[in-house]
């Protein structure tokens, strides 16, 4: 849950939540283009045993977009709720994305990005300051929104890497 990342060069710590939706949608389009550009023989292959295949990064992002929207809903609907941390490695392994249809996943990812963007655009005044505790860390709606964008930006690099794009 970050809005500054030295690894991928992302720094949107001053971007207001209201501006995140359109930017997220643009980055998500780049993700979809990158996935479609990965050579078929590399799409489902892990470069190393502990590094996800490109299609697994897409599956993770599909989950991540729904999770971020759900977190924002919880933070706005309740008074600083506590939400347990999730393990992305576990859920990606359980979903078996390497056996999934890539166009199905791209469609689901796109719909979840659009839903998250619409949700951000419709946030009531002051909602960006609503907060929750994820694991042991207090976070605001504004950070959750920027973090969703960072997820796409960060994994765009992971998806491009194995194909050398
Ligand atoms: Zn990053």
Predicted regions and their residues:
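Short, contiguous alpha-helical
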Residues: 1-2, 44-88, 129-165
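Amphipathic, non-membrane alpha-helical segments in soluble helical-bundle scaffolds
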Residues: 17-28, 51-58, 99-106, 141-145
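Non-transmembrane alpha-helical segments in soluble domains
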Residues: 21, 32, 55-58, 62, ...
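Acidic/histidine-rich alpha-helical segments that form the ligand environment
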Residues: 23-27, 32, 90-129, 148
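A glycine-rich, hydrophobic loop/mini-helix early in the fold
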Residues: 26-52
């Amino acid at each position: 849950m970050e809005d500054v990342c030295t690894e991928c060069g992302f720094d949107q710590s001053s971007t207001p939540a209201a501006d995140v939706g359109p930017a997220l949608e643009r980055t998500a389009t780049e993700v979809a283009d990158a996935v479609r550009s990965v050579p078929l023989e590399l799409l489902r292959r892990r470069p190393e045993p502990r590094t996800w295949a490109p299609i697994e990064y897409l599956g993770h992002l599909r989950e991540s977009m729904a999770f971020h929207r759900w977190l924002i809903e919880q933070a706005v609907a309740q008074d600083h709720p506590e939400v347990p941390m999730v393990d992305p490695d576990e859920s990606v392994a359980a979903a078996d994305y390497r056996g999934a249809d890539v166009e199905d996943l791209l469609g689901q990812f796109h719909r979840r990005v659009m839903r998250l963007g619409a949700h951000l655009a419709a946030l009531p005044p002051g909602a960006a300051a609503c907060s929750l505790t994820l694991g042991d860390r207090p976070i605001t709606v504004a950070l959750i929104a920027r973090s969703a964008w960072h997820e796409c930006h960060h994994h765009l690099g992971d998806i491009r890497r194995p194909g050398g794009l």
